[in-house]
UniProtKB/Swiss-Prot annotation:
Origin species: Sesamum indicum
Subcellular location: Lipid droplet; Membrane
Protein name as catalogued: Oleosin L
Matching InterPro entries: Oleosin (IPR000136)
Domain notes: The proline-knot motif may be involved in the targeting to oil bodies.
Membrane topology, as annotated: Multi-pass membrane protein
Chain's role: May have a structural role to stabilize the lipid body during desiccation of the seed by preventing coalescence of the oil. Probably interacts with both lipid and phospholipid moieties of lipid bodies. May also provide recognition signals for specific lipase anchorage in lipolysis during seedling growth.
Positions with biased composition (Polar residues): 133-145
Tissue distribution: Expressed in seeds (at protein level).
Length: 145
């Protein structure tokens, strides 16, 4: 039973065993940066909504009939809170996915990420080889001494 569990753990997170610690730290820092920026965006949206409503509501009440600004205010309030909550949920979802990826729990889409990373690395190697090959070719019309 213990052997089966150990084999299962090894097959579940092979990308973590091959990665150096520095690369995992960089991934974690990137995850925190991405999630943190989404959380900050969520907070700024909430603050902007509250400030806009604070400024706009009295003006709408003074210069419009009573029902129109009430409907507009309720719409703006709802839209602002929904956007703020949506950004917060998105940030938490991203942080959760990245945490599961870094701990080797294989979240949905991890295979696609690994495949894209492999393709990108192979294309980068191919472009490097082409650049080296191109730099070694003699330029037409140049004189050789």
């Amino acid at each position: 039973m213990a052997e089966h569990y150990g084999q299962q753990q090894q097959t579940r997170a092979p990308h973590l065993q091959l990665q150096p610690r520095a690369q995992r730290v960089v991934k974690a820092a990137t995850a925190v940066t991405a999630g943190g920026s989404l959380l900050v965006l969520s907070g700024l949206t909430l603050a902007g909504t509250v400030i806009a409503l604070t400024i706009a509501t009295p003006l709408l009440v003074i210069f419009s009939p009573v029902l129109v600004p009430a409907v507009i205010t309720i719409f703006l309030l709802g839209a602002g809170f929904l956007a703020s909550g949506g950004f917060g949920v998105a940030a938490l979802s991203v942080l959760s996915w990245i945490y599961r990826y870094l701990t080797g729990k294989h979240p949905p889409g991890a295979d696609q990420l690994e495949s894209a990373k492999t393709k990108l690395a192979s294309k980068a190697r191919e472009m490097k080889d082409r650049a080296e090959q191109f730099s070694q070719q003699p330029v037409a019309g140049s004189q050789t001494s």
